Amino acid sequence: MTKQHAFTREDLLRCSRGELFGPGNAQLPAPNMLMIDRIVHISDVGGKYGKGELVAELDINPDLWFFACHFEGDPVMPGCLGLDAMWQLVGFYLGWQGNPGRGRALGSGEVKFFGQVLPTAKKVTYNIHIKRTINRSLVLAIADGTVSVDGREIYSAEGLRVGLFTSTDSF
C-alpha cells in the first residue's frame, strides 16, 4: 500500500479524533491546540539527514484565539505554540510510519526565537528534519525543526524528541 504524502485540515482533524492511525495510536491535539492546517509534504527519506522530512503550514488570521490574550494591546503568537507544533509533527511522523502508541513530547535540545508571528502575517511554515528513529520498547524520533512566517525563519529547535507509548500508566 502506498503511503499518503500530504494531508488536509480534515485529515488532521481525523487524526485528532484518533481515526487516522487507529484507536490508541498517535493523535494530534484537537483545535484550539492543533497548530497545523495542512501537511504539504511528508517523506521517510530526504531532509537534512536523509531520514525523513515534513513541511506543514498554518494559516494566520487576526481572529486566532491566542492573539486576544497574548498580549492585550500587543498581540503575538506564543513561541511555545510553534514549538508544540514541531512536536506535533514529529509525533505525526511516527504514527504515519505505522508505529503503535500514544505520542508524548519528551524534550528538546536548543530552542531559539529570533522573530515573531503577528496578526498581520499570512502563513507559518514548519520544516522538520528527522535525525533518528528508534524502535525498541519505546518508539522514539529525534528531529530538528524550524518555523518560518511569510518566508522568514523565526524559530529553530534542535533535538526535538517525541515518543510513542503503548501504555502511559507509568509515564
Curated annotation (Swiss-Prot):
Superkingdom assignment: Bacteria
Keywords noted in UniProt: Cytoplasm, Fatty acid biosynthesis, Fatty acid metabolism, Isomerase, Lipid biosynthesis, Lipid metabolism, Lyase
Pfam families linked: FabA
Oligomer and partners: Homodimer.
Chief location of this protein within or outside the cell: cytoplasm
Cell location: Cytoplasm
GO cellular component: cytoplasm
HAMAP family: FabA
GO biological process, one term: unsaturated fatty acid biosynthetic process
Gene Ontology MF annotations: (3R)-hydroxyacyl-[acyl-carrier-protein] dehydratase activity; trans-2-decenoyl-acyl-carrier-protein isomerase activity
Listed pathway(s): Lipid metabolism; fatty acid biosynthesis
Record-listed E.C. numbers: 4.2.1.59, 5.3.3.14
Keyword flag RNA-binding: no
Keyword Isomerase: yes
Catalytic activity line of the entry: a (3R)-hydroxyacyl-[ACP] = a (2E)-enoyl-[ACP] + H2O; (3R)-hydroxydecanoyl-[ACP] = (2E)-decenoyl-[ACP] + H2O; (2E)-decenoyl-[ACP] = (3Z)-decenoyl-[ACP]
UniProt xrefs under InterPro entries: FabA, FabA_FabZ, HotDog_dom_sf
Name under which the protein is recorded: 3-hydroxydecanoyl-[acyl-carrier-protein] dehydratase
Function: Necessary for the introduction of cis unsaturation into fatty acids. Catalyzes the dehydration of (3R)-3-hydroxydecanoyl-ACP to E-(2)-decenoyl-ACP and then its isomerization to Z-(3)-decenoyl-ACP. Can catalyze the dehydratase reaction for beta-hydroxyacyl-ACPs with saturated chain lengths up to 16:0, being most active on intermediate chain length.
Positions annotated as active site in the UniProt record: H70
Family recorded in the similarity comment: Belongs to the thioester dehydratase family. FabA subfamily.
